Amino acid sequence: ARLAAVAYDALVVRRAATAFARTSKKTRFEQERPSSPALAQSPSPSKKNVNALCFDLARTDLGNAICSWRDFDAIALDTAMRAAIGKEPIADADADATKETPAPRVSGILQKTTLAAMEHLGLFEKVPAIKKQNVANFLKALEKQYASPEYHSAVHAADVVQAVLFILAPTGLESDLVHRIDPNAVFALLIAASAHDVGHPGLNNAFLCNTEDPRAARWNDVSVNENGHLHVCLSLLKEHKVFDGLPENLRKQCKATIGRLILSTDMAHHTRLVEEFVDVAANAIEAANLGGGGGNYCGSFAHHNRDDGSRIANWKDPTLALCFVLHCADISNPARPWSTAREWGRRVTEEFHKQGDCERARGVPVAALNDRNASGDVDKTTAANQAAFLEYVVEPT
């Protein structure tokens, strides 16, 4: 009976989502026209002509693409920023000459993307107690704490931040989700998105536990990577006094929300998170249809511009909705435009293979997904894996 109820709830939510998508699709794409040819045609970092476009890309205002699903390409922007930083004019007779300097480990893509997202939503005006300079300092330090695995890098974090923004405000209209969430909660969500993989070693939780890594021992084999990300995030938030201007109760609430958000990105929670969200969302829809309103369980995160059941503050567990937004953004890159999605697929495959190399070197069983020796045609294997991920994880979510 419970399975039948869950299935029915899922059907109700899916039908509602489909109806909304049909009515909003035209508006979304009308407002999503490419505003910059350079960004609209961002080349893959592997293309030979990337250097020819790097300076134009680096000079382009990020605001032109920050709210567009098609135009935003974190990989191309990161490549452009690194190339621009790595070229310095030579002060001699040859005015056209340049000298190459080592590419910087930090391009600034995460800081710039997150600040652009916050500014696009007007968060610094809505929450004046949070100072932009403190946030900028936090993000700069945060980006430096990201390691450089192929996939779980600061570039991925920037991609997730922009995906969160697009989910919150796809049309720029009053009907957007962002208007149903308190600005303090939106701040917490974007901070969590920016920090959700900080310090990721390119090795999954199972590997760290199976090899008795010190990090696994520290976090008792529970969401090892995610607990590490949260620890770094909270330490940097305190160091840079990001929430110092908020009342104590709201400061604690923001930190608790960030904690739950980052821990929810552990893929081990995927199935339970989706099931819980469908259940809570269906109940909220039912309560709204019955005119009940659902009650306000959100404390100081309450937002009083809306009284209908779609207002997140009216949900029994409003933070669950934020967790679901972050999770959707975290797994969304296969749904990016083809050239971008293909590069993300290549990167995650290489990260898996490098873990497989570590597994083989440590004498532990090599997971099939991580075994580069068994992959055969890597491109075909990557395509098959990405297609399966889309079918069984991304699309149902």
Locations of regions flagged by a protein language model:
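Internal amphipathic alpha-helical repeat/solenoid segments
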Residues: 122-149, 169
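Active-site-adjacent "gating/activation" loops or surface patches in catalytic cores
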Residues: 133, 149-168, 198
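Membrane-embedded alpha-helical segments that form the functional core of polytopic membrane enzymes
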Residues: 186-190
